Swiss-Prot record:
It comes from the Bacteria. This is ATP synthase subunit delta. F(1)F(0) ATP synthase produces ATP from ADP in the presence of a proton or sodium gradient. F-type ATPases consist of two structural domains, F(1) containing the extramembraneous catalytic core and F(0) containing the membrane proton channel, linked together by a central stalk and a peripheral stalk. During catalysis, ATP synthesis in the catalytic domain of F(1) is coupled via a rotary mechanism of the central stalk subunits to proton translocation. GO terms for molecular function: proton-transporting ATP synthase activity, rotational mechanism. It is found in: Cell inner membrane. It comes from Shewanella baltica (strain OS155 / ATCC BAA-1091). It holds the Pfam family OSCP.
Length: 177
């Protein structure tokens, strides 16, 4: 994965810089997300791994994407195809999203709770995280009954484990040491 990120970084950075220059960050994010989905399609995978000429591969890829990809996006696809890098489009899209979130001072937080969180609870978590991180927070909520009760919040390198399962695990570790 680190190798894919290293390969994808220059493409993502160039696309992001261009998107800022053109004031089209959101449309580029949508375009790259769509192109990444196309590259991950099971029908497209063998073509990306195959020996199809780069110009034919780029033309095929662009025709599949259709109007979802503008002229500048098509140029990026052509350059990536020439360099045999279309298979890293998902990593390019992910890095682009990270650059966009950093630029917009936004962060995504994964919140796993034992039970479904109410909208009020989600709002309280969001407000607390926004104060702590000094960024706008978008929550991705899911449930896991194995937590027993409480929540686990993950964003970037920060992990807040407020679950009963986590507390029991830490207590067990203390008792065993």
């Amino acid at each position: 994965m680190a190798e894919l990120t290293t390969i994808a970084r220059p493409y993502a950075k160039a696309a992001f810089d261009f998107a800022i220059e053109q004031d089209a960050v959101d449309s580029w994010a949508e375009m790259l997300t769509f192109a990444a989905l196309v590259s991950e399609n099971e029908t497209m995978q063998p073509l990306l791994a195959g020996s199809l000429a780069s110009t034919k591969l780029a033309a095929l890829f662009i025709s599949v994407c259709g109007e979802q990809v503008n002229v500048q996006g098509q140029n990026l696809i052509k350059v990536m195809a020439e360099n045999g890098r279309l298979k890293v489009l998902p990593a390019v899209s992910q890095l682009f999203t990270e650059y966009r979130n950093e630029w917009a001072k936004e962060v995504e937080a994964d919140v796993v709770s034992a039970t479904e969180l109410s909208s009020e609870q989600q709002q309280q978590i969001s407000i607390s995280l926004e104060k702590r991180l000094a960024r706008k927070v978008k929550l991705n909520c899911s449930t896991d009954a194995a937590l027993i009760a409480g929540v686990i919040i993950k964003t970037g390198d920060l992990v807040i484990d407020g679950s009963v399962r986590g507390k029991l695990s830490r207590l067990s570790d203390k008792l065993q040491s």
